[in-house]
Amino acid sequence: MDGTFLDHLGAYDKARLDNLLDACEAKDYVFTVASGRALLALEELFDGFVDRIAIIAENGALVQYKGEVLFESKLEPKDYLQIADTTLSLPTCEGILLSGRRGAYAPNDADPAYLKAMERYYENVMATDLEAVTDDIFKVTAKFQGDTIMERGDYLNTIFEDMTAVTTGFDSMDIILKGV
């Protein structure tokens, strides 16, 4: 959505969207937002419109229509903890985040600057003991030094056969269940 639907400030014309939704509804079209962002962040961004749109969040791991969850693909704790440990051990990894239904979780020792930067894309960002997380987790996001991201993605795709690492288009990678 950055650089397409959203302007350089990360905003959009709400009156224009309202008019567009009226036109879509008149033709029985469904306006759908598709993003790698978390559902909470998208609900916040589209506040006032959630009951009129479909949202495909978390790179497809969570689908909601008019506020009702239609599909979700959650990671098991053993899987996201293994992904987190492996990813954090890579020399060019600058931070990881577990993206959940109620918030986003980074390790206790996460760089505060990384947490602050992630607040642009996630709601309720917090540093915590990842083993104590009880939220539903849909993906693991990892930030890498820019020139190593493709190499790291290939590596992660090799060692986690049931997962897929996809670039976010910037210097981060989302790791989700394969087939999502």
Give the ranges of each region predicted by the language model:
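Asp-based phosphoryl-transfer active-site loop
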Residues: 1-11, 33-35
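A short, flexible beta-alpha/helix-coil linker loop
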Residues: 4-5, 62-63, 171-173
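A short local structural element in Rossmann-fold oxidoreductases
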Residues: 6, 43, 153
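Short, contiguous strand/loop micro-motifs
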Residues: 6-8, 29, 70-71, 139
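Glycine- and other small-residue-rich loops at beta-strand/loop junctions that grip anionic moieties
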Residues: 9, 34, 72, 175-178
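Short beta->alpha junction loops/turns
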Residues: 10, 76, 145-146
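Active-site phosphate-binding/coordination module
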Residues: 14-113
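Conserved acidic, metal-coordinating active-site core of Asp-based
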Residues: 93-180
